[in-house]
């Protein structure tokens, strides 16, 4: 099984959304085709996927706003976990963002998900204590 890490295409959007649902990722109101297609149009390199045998089995959003790099939606299919795909997706996101000029990267992680927080700690990223995230919409 050859694994490819690449930028997502518009045709990947249904598979990415299905991956998010099947993996148990915490849903948000922007988990829809229109939002992902808008992301790809705005920044064609932001959504990165892992593909095995022509099937999307992982994703990460590596968002660059010109100031700071943000990593969202790191998801790996349950059937492909513990194969190093999460780490490869994070490395692809880091490379994309650092190459774009980001000096600081941040990851948005569900605090109550021990699998996710454990993964991020294992990658060497540090939890920033004392900060809260405020959102609207």
Name each model-derived stretch.
Residues 37-49, 70:
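A short helix-loop-beta-strand connector motif used in the catalytic cores of GNAT acetyltransferases and
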Residues 107-116, 135-137:
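Conserved beta-strand-loop-alpha-helix junction that forms the acyl-donor binding cleft
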Residues 74-81, 109:
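A short, internal acetyl-CoA/4′-phosphopantetheine-binding micro-motif in the GNAT/acyltransferase core
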Residues 49, 55-63, 70-75:
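Conserved beta-strand in the GNAT
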Residues 121-130:
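Conserved acetyl-CoA-binding loop of GNAT-fold acetyltransferases
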Residues 2-16:
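A short beta-loop-alpha structural element at the N-terminal edge
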Residues 97-110:
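Conserved GNAT acetyl-CoA-binding A-motif
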Residues 82-95, 122:
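Conserved acetyl-CoA-binding loop-helix of GNAT-fold acetyltransferases
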